[in-house]
């Protein structure tokens, strides 16, 4: 099946060119120059985020959490189950899905990998299935309470090995993400009984404080 007026050119640059106008060409892979503009950078990360959320693999991951791990209930209000209310996977309490996609894009750039939304999204999904992404099951009420900072989510309530994720990806964190980690660590030490869920020594070793 052919897409009307579109011809795929299988060269190294991986360009898709309009048949009726050779000069109308869209590169299949992105270059570093494509991310110089902040708005273009943000649009790309959001596109990756959307691709992850809407993928069949992500739906399979959520199904695994609910039906294999048995986490089909709110981990704040444990009596609220998926049977009676919508219970969703919330990325956090430190890294949002946008953060994770952004870190993966930075990794692709710094390691010289070919970049497009599909490749970065695949890498993000691999992190989910390797259980390195921190997340917690929340109902609508607890989700709103978390975003309003009415409740504190402890990493011990979550699935995913956040300490390994930090150790393996810290060199790709920007200052905003580093600040999030240090701020959460401060809350753990001063406003909550973290009980070692977040490995403070790991954070201090791999993440320098933001001045």
Question: Language-model segments: what does each one mean?
Answer:
Residues 77-79, 140-143:
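Cys/His-coordinated zinc-binding microdomains
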Residues 1-83, 96, 172-211:
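A boundary/linker detector
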Residues 73, 88, 138:
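The −1 position to Zn-ligating cysteines in a subset of zinc-ribbon hairpins
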Residues 89-98, 154-164:
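Short cysteine/histidine-rich metal-coordination sites, predominantly Zn2+-binding motifs
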Residues 79-134:
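Histidine-centered nuclease catalytic patch
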């Amino acid at each position: 099946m052919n897409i009307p007026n579109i011809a795929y050119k299988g060269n190294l640059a991986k360009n898709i060119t309009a048949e009726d106008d050779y000069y109308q060409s869209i590169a299949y892979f992105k270059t570093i120059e494509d991310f110089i503009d902040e708005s273009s950078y943000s649009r790309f990360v959001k596109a990756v985020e959307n691709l992850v959320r809407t993928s069949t693999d992500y739906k399979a991951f959520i199904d695994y959490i609910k039906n294999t791990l048995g986490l089909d209930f709110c981990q704040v209000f444990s009596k609220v189950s998926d049977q009676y209310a919508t219970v969703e996977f919330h990325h956090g309490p430190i890294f949002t899905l946008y953060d994770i996609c952004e870190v993966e894009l930075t990794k692709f750039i710094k390691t010289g990998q070919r970049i497009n939304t599909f490749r970065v999204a695949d890498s993000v999904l691999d992190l989910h299935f390797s259980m390195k992404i921190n997340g917690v099951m929340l109902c609508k009420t607890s989700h709103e309470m978390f975003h309003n900072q009415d409740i504190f989510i402890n990493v011990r309530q979550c699935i995913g090995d956040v300490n390994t994720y930090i150790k393996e990806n810290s060199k790709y964190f920007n200052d905003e993400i580093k600040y999030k980690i240090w701020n959460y660590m401060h809350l753990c030490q001063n406003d909550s009984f973290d009980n070692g869920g977040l490995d403070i020594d790991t954070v201090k070793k791999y993440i320098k404080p933001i001045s």
